[in-house]
Regions:
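N-terminal beta-strand block that forms a small beta-sandwich/beta-barrel module immediately after a flexible targeting
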Residues: 17-64, 68
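Surface-exposed patches in structured soluble domains
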Residues: 39-43, 57-62, 68-74, 136-139, ...
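Membrane-entry signal-anchor segments at the cytosolic-membrane interface
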Residues: 1-19
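Extended amphipathic alpha-helical segments
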Residues: 34-36, 85, 89-92, 96-106, ...
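Hydrophobic alpha-helix/coiled-coil detector that fires on Leu/Ile/Phe-packed helical surfaces
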Residues: 26-35, 189, 195-202, 209-221, ...
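Short, conserved beta-turn/loop elements at beta-strand boundaries and strand-helix junctions
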Residues: 47-48, 63, 169, 228-234
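Short, solvent-exposed secondary-structure boundary/capping segments
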Residues: 231-244
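Extracytoplasmic/periplasmic/luminal assembly and interaction segments
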Residues: 59-103
């Protein structure tokens, strides 16, 4: 009898252990299924690529690599010598055009005063000449304004608060208008993108709270889902010969869930965390 009770006790203990293990496994599975998470996350930021509006040799670089800059701080300057000459030339042209305009207008007034003596064609010609001179004067003023603007743009300033990154510009380098010479990471633009499996998207909604863990820090960041990506690449969408779709002739029976980018806006930033664009992150979306 004792042996039977002992055997039943062992069976009961085993069944209890299995039941507890099953319950724990179910709880973890449910949490995994209803709390989307991914280790495939990245810290992102807007990188402002700054190009000059005028071309010329760089005369001064006012910043260092990885330096903090405020909006409006000078980054570098282009040699302004030829730009100053352009301003002086435009000023001289404005003065010449102004004198010509005044002379033509005076001639038109004098012709108008004696219109009974001279022909109407002569009056019209002098009036047209005065109008053309006035238009030329306005054109000279515009050219002067453009020359002054180019001179002002010889000094390149930061449009945002942030960090100079990957600086390779040196005095003496030639800067071409429209060609990026300095890049700045906008300090106020950091966000996190998490790549979630498509099977988890049904549990992700805009506005839901997100917990972010960075690989290099112990503290967690808190944010919320700002948006969900609406498109990812398709390898079968390439264009082949004759403009026809180039569809892969083979199909793998092992179907892996596609990953969709989810943008996370950061809400709280613990002290001591220095965000760097490109850092690895794990992201969990709260129920």
């Amino acid at each position: 009898m004792k042996s039977l009770l002992s055997l039943l006790g062992r069976y009961a203990l085993t069944l209890s252990a299995v039941a507890v293990a099953t319950l724990v496994a179910f709880i973890f599975w449910k949490q995994y299924a209803q709390t989307p998470w991914t280790r495939d996350g990245r810290v992102r930021a807007d990188v402002v690529q700054i190009a000059p509006d005028v071309s010329g040799p760089v005369s001064r670089v006012a910043v260092r690599d990885n330096q903090w800059v405020n909006r409006g701080d000078i980054l570098y300057a282009i040699d302004p010598h030829w730009l100053k000459l352009a301003v002086l030339s435009s000023q001289a042209d404005v003065e010449a055009k102004r004198h010509e305009m005044l002379m033509r207008q005076d001639a038109a007034r004098r012709r108008a005063m004696i219109k009974g003596v001279i022909s109407s064609e002569d009056i019209q010609q002098t009036g047209s000449a005065a109008s053309i001179a006035a238009a030329n004067y306005q054109g000279a003023l515009t050219a002067l304004e453009l020359a002054q603007l180019n001179l002002a743009h010889a000094t390149v300033r930061s449009p945002v608060d942030g960090y100079v990154t990957h600086l390779r510009l040196r005095p003496g380098d030639y800067a071409t208008a429209g060609e990026t010479k300095v890049a700045i990471v906008d300090a106020h633009s950091f966000w996190v993108v998490g790549y979630f499996e498509e099977t988890k998207l049904s549990h992700i909604r805009v506005g839901k709270t997100a917990q972010i863990s960075l690989m290099g820090f112990d503290s967690q960041l808190i944010g919320h889902v700002e948006s969900i990506g609406r498109g990812i690449g398709d390898s079968n969408d390439e264009t082949g010969g004759l403009g026809l779709p180039d569809v892969n002739p083979t199909f793998s029976w092992v179907r892996l869930a596609q990953r969709v980018p989810v943008r996370i806006q950061l809400d709280t930033m613990p002290a001591g965390i220095e965000l760097v664009a490109g850092l690895s992150a794990s992201v969990s979306i709260m129920p």
